[in-house]
Each structure stands twice: as C-alpha cells, then as structure tokens.
From Swiss-Prot:
Record function comment: Involved in the biosynthesis of lipid A, a phosphorylated glycolipid that anchors the lipopolysaccharide to the outer membrane of the cell.
Alphabetic keyword roster: Acyltransferase, Cytoplasm, Lipid A biosynthesis, Lipid biosynthesis, Lipid metabolism, Repeat, Transferase
Catalytic activity: a (3R)-hydroxyacyl-[ACP] + UDP-N-acetyl-alpha-D-glucosamine = a UDP-3-O-[(3R)-3-hydroxyacyl]-N-acetyl-alpha-D-glucosamine + holo-[ACP]
Species of origin: Pseudomonas putida (strain W619)
Protein name as catalogued: Acyl-[acyl-carrier-protein]--UDP-N-acetylglucosamine O-acyltransferase
Quaternary structure and partners: Homotrimer.
Top-level class of the enzyme under EC nomenclature: transferase
Family named by the database record: Belongs to the transferase hexapeptide repeat family. LpxA subfamily.
Length: 258
C-alpha cells in the first residue's frame, strides 16, 4: 500500500509501485515510474521520462529528471534511469540526457549522492559510488563502480572516472582518472592509489601489491603512456584488477590525469 501525502501532486500518468511514499508538496510529473518501496520526501520534483527503481530514498528539495540546460537540447524525448537502493540527499539535481549522446542519464544501484550534488545530462554513474556534498559532474561524465568523489569535486564534460578511484576535496578534474587512482588539486594531479578503499573491500595483499607496482610503472618511472601500458601487460595477465587499471588507461579518450 502506498502512502501519498494529500498535499503532494501526482500526475495521473505516473506509475507508482506498491509501498511507495511521497511527502508533502512533492510533484511527480507525467511519465515518471517509481519502484517498490521508494520513499520520496517533501518538496521533491520528479519530471519524466524518468524511471526510478526499488527501495530508493530521495530527500527534500531535490530536482530529478529535469530538462538539460545544454543549448543543443530542443525538447527531444530523453530520459533518466535510476536503479535500486540509492540514497539521494537534499537539493540534488539530476538532468535527463540529450539525443546528441545516449538520450539517457543513468544512475546504477547502491549509490549515495550527498547534498547539493549535480549529475549532468548523459552521465553514467555505476554502483556503490559516493558523490559527497556539492560535487558537480558536467555532461557525458562516466563514473565507475565504487568511486568516491569528495566534496566540491568538479568534473569536466566527457571525463571518465575509473572504478575505485578517489578524489580529494575541491579537486578539479579535466582528464580521465584511471581505476583505483587517487587525485587531488586544481587542476587534479595523481597522488597514489585508493589503497584504504581496497582494504575495506577485502582486496588481498597480493592484489594490492600488484596494483602498487602498476602505479609506479605508470606514474614513477618516467615512461610515456604507451610504454607504461606495455610494461603492465605481464601483471595484467595475472591480476584482473591490474587489467582493469590498464584498460582504463588504454580506453581513455581525454588522456589520463598524471
């Protein structure tokens, strides 16, 4: 059974599964779907086409699924897709996609999006990510699983943040960040790898040692990117985690943060 505050506005075309809660003065617009057990707080605006999965919680003053401010956007049908078990805190803004890219913005599962963060059009956020307060992603940004972006991190459009990467507070990211790499500063510079995150997630000492060696190859031996990638081949063949690091470098379109 749903719990809809009488002061909320629900469009007749919106689809709400069982167990959905909607707080006072929230607006659920046309072509919005909300999955089972999701809780929408007060003063939330949901605009479609937007699909929200199960057991999410969205806090007050968030604007979810609004049109992109991209000047190329002319009202074409685009959408936002949000997975399951996400927490979206106060004042978060997430825009739908554009037809010039995927026509979709995607947020995966088990993410924590903290207060006043922004996720721009056509961005893709993986699973188990944390975007700390006031983090802002421009359009077309990709964030890999388990990445953590500290408060006031800014990410340039089209940048890719690799899985398990970490940014320090106030970091300005203008190039791709390889998987596992920790970056700080404005502009961002690579400082180390997210070894603390690896330990918390149960990575073995052997894997952590291999990743430490891999980081030194790329960042400490004075090699070109092409030379470093070749040097990583042997370790990547032994450890999938090193291969993930290597592939995030190989697939970089903007160049990697160094």
């Amino acid at each position: 059974m749903n719990s809809i505050d009488p002061r909320a506005i629900i469009d007749p075309s919106a689809k709400l599964a069982d167990g959905v809660e909607v707080g006072p003065w929230s607006i659920v617009g046309p072509d919005v779907e909300i999955g089972e057990g999701t809780v929408i707080g007060p003063h939330v605006v949901l605009k479609g086409p937007t699909r929200i999965g199960k057991h999410n919680r969205i806090y007050q003053f968030s604007s979810i699924g609004e049109d992109t401010p991209d000047l190329k956007y002319k009202g074409e049908p685009t959408r936002l897709v949000i997975g399951d078990h996400n927490v979206i805190r106060e004042g978060v803004t997430i825009h739908r996609g554009t037809v010039q890219d995927r026509a979709e913005t995607t947020l995966g599962d088990h993410n924590l999006i903290m207060a006043y963060a922004h996720i721009g059009h056509d961005s893709v956020i993986g699973n188990h990510c944390i975007l700390v307060n006031n983090t802002a992603l421009a359009g077309h940004v990709h964030v890999g699983d388990w990445a953590i972006l500290s408060g006031f991190t800014l990410v340039h459009q089209y940048c890719h943040i690799g899985a398990h990467a970490f940014s320090g507070m106030g970091t300005a990211i203008g190039k791709d960040v390889p998987a596992f790499v920790t970056v700080f500063g404005s502009p961002a510079e690579a400082r180390s790898m997210n070894f603390e995150g690896m330990r918390r997630r149960g990575f073995s000492d052997e894997v952590i040692h291999a990743l430490r060696r891999s980081y030194k190859i790329v960042y400490r031996q004075g090699l070109t990117v092409e030379e470093a990638v070749k040097e990583l081949d042997e370790l990547a063949g032994k450890h999938p985690e090193v291969d993930l690091f290597r592939q995030s470098i190989v697939n970089s379109a903007r160049g990697i943060t160094r």
